[in-house]
Regions:
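N-terminal cationic amphipathic segment used for targeting or macromolecule association
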Residues: 1, 20, 29-32, 47, ...
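Short aromatic-glycine-(Arg/Gly/Cys) micro-motifs in beta-strand/loop hairpins
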Residues: 1-21, 38, 61, 79
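Generic hydrophobic secondary-structure signal
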Residues: 3-6, 24-25, 35, 44, ...
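A residue-level detector for conformationally permissive "hinge/kink" positions
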Residues: 5-7, 31, 53, 63
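Residue-level signal for short segments within beta-strands and strand-turn junctions
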Residues: 7-10, 26, 68, 81-83
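Short, flexible N-terminal segments of the mature chain
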Residues: 18-41
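Short, mixed-charge low-complexity intrinsically disordered segments
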Residues: 37-85
Length: 85
């Protein structure tokens, strides 16, 4: 059986600890919806916190990355496929 793990990692400020979290989904579609939802929510937070549109976004089918232009604050959402028995 395959499961899809959404791994969230982020650093909010240069020198701060990198935080991680993971969620497991039974379909790739659910995992993709999760990273899209998380990415859009994070993007809104960036707009409010940074009070500008000065950030970078990279998106693919299994990856969502958002960061400020200095790279001091960033959020990643990745999907990893895992086979379990």
């Amino acid at each position: 059986m395959k499961v899809y793990v959404v791994i969230t990692s982020y650093q909010h400020g240069l020198g701060e600890a990198v935080e991680t979290d993971a969620e497991v989904f039974d379909t790739i579609d659910k995992a993709r919806k999760a990273i899209e939802r998380k990415g859009l929510k994070t993007l809104e937070s960036y707009k409010q916190a940074l009070d500008c549109d000065d950030f970078q976004i990279s998106v693919s089918g299994s990856f969502y990355h958002i960061s400020d232009n200095e790279g001091e604050t960033w959020d990643n959402f990745d999907i990893v496929e895992q086979e379990i028995n």
